[in-house]
Amino acid sequence: MKKLLMILFTTLLLVGCNTNKSIKIEQEVGLLQTVKERGYVVCGVNAGLPGFSAQDDAGNWSGLDVDFCKAVSAGIFGDSSKVEFVGLNAAQRFPTLASGNIDVLARNTTWTISRDVNLMFEFAGVNYYDGQGFLVPTHLEIRSATQLDGAFVCITKETTSELNLNDYFAENNMQYQPIYVEGNKDAKAKLFAGECDVFTTDASGLASARAGAEDPSKWVVLPEIISKEPLGPLVRQGDQEWEDVVRWTMFIMINAEEAGITSKNVDLMLTSKSKEVKRILGVEGYIGPMLGLGMKFGYNIIQQVGNYGESFERNVGPNTPLALERGLNQLWNKGGILYVPPIR
């Protein structure tokens, strides 16, 4: 009997060892390897939010979130063009990421505990600090959000914007009539057609909507900001290697701005005496190899896409239709709260 029990124990032990070995092999073949073999990154973005992600008439994508996806591609392949963009509305974004049909979601998405924990996603960081506001036509002569009692409000269902709106109106003893929309494009159409009195979403989205109006001067964003909306890219939980690649792509862009490295001077900076600059560009250290990538990981990102500040100015800054100031999205040492771990 003892001999039989010993045989059974040994068999179970061997099976357990083999199972662990199998699991280890599966874990080692992560998404980064899959992306490398496929030859491009699949990135989920907003289907139509000028300044953040939108297509022109020729089908070319541009925007702050689009630049981030291109940066991920540049860091992996040394080529920022190896990206397939998938336009998604608010209802589609999480199921599409969870299903594995996209590698990363960079779609003006707010980092919350429920999305982080319940949906089993990991946010790579914050690439835009925002807050929810209200856009109204000037002819209504509304000066404050506290005057919106009874208003017809264009709102995207099942978003943080809807939850914040409910809280704000309840706390101020007001009521509203929801006009549900599919996204910013649908909201603009309904707002400009007079189907709702006000559109509420992240302030950056309101700036984008106002810029797209036939006459932007006929629309005003009210002064109240009713929420915190830290927006950033996210990936599925359970793949630390891929999460690190996505996260440090963002951190490279922000650290590069802090170090004064731009797409215009990146080649000159290769000879910089600064140890930080050398680490960012791969002249010294092993930042790229630590992520499973090449030595020119940081260099390729900055050379082909630029640092965070360049991307901001190009897509949403004061000289664009959105005309947004850096505000909270300025570097920590220049009055903002943009602060990321060092390259060390």
Give the positions of each predicted feature.
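C-terminal functional modules
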Residues: V283-R344
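C-terminal motif of bacterial Sec signal peptides marking the signal peptidase cleavage site
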Residues: L14-G16
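Sec-dependent signal peptide recognition
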Residues: K2-L8
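Short, hydrophobic alpha-helical packing/hinge segments within bilobed ligand-binding/sensory domains
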Residues: L31, F68-C69, Q92-L97, N184-K190, ...
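Extended ligand-binding regions for polar small-molecule ligands
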Residues: N18-E26, D67-K70, A74, H139-I142, ...
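Extracytoplasmic small-molecule ligand-binding "clamshell" domains
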Residues: K24-A106, L331
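Acidic, polar ligand-binding/catalytic clefts
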Residues: K70, A74, G78-Q147, S204-I225, ...
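Bilobed "Venus flytrap"/periplasmic-binding protein-like clamshell domains
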Residues: V42-G51, W61-I76, T110, D130-D186
